[in-house]
């Protein structure tokens, strides 16, 4: 099997982390804003199942390319315990941060109107700001 280049691995991490945050935070936004909008009747089970599918899809997308670390803590642990190259740790973490930021930005843009109508989305972690 052909070895992947570092750039391919980093792109895999960006896409995987993007998908993880897009789908995971997306379900939190949907459930959190639903009572304030037209829908309703969702609970923590919906969030749990949504995050489970987010992880499954993100691992499926990036697993074959980068190993699907998708989290700086996983990357650091892999370097400490599993022989992952220390030279790749910082690039992987940067790729994960970029992917997470892009995923959160996409959720914000998709749910911007709902966040604004719910009121002051940047202040309370128990309110609309809890989406992020």
What are these regions (language model features)?
Residues 1-132:
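Membrane-interface helix-loop junctions and terminal tails of multi-pass membrane proteins
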């Amino acid at each position: 099997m052909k070895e992947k280049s570092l750039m391919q691995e980093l792109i895999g991490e960006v896409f995987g982390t993007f998908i993880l945050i897009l789908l995971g935070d997306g379900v939190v936004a949907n459930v959190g804003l639903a009572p304030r909008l037209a829908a309703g009747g969702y609970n923590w089970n919906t969030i749990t199942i949504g995050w489970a599918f987010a992880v499954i899809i993100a691992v499926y997308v990036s697993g074959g390319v980068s190993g699907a670390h998708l989290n700086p803590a996983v990357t650091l642990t892999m370097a400490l315990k599993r022989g992952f190259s220390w030279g790749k740790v910082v690039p992987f973490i940067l790729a994960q941060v970029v992917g997470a930021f892009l995923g959160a930005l996409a959720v914000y843009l998709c749910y911007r109107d709902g966040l604004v109508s719910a009121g002051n989305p940047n202040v309370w972690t128990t309110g609309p700001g809890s989406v992020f």
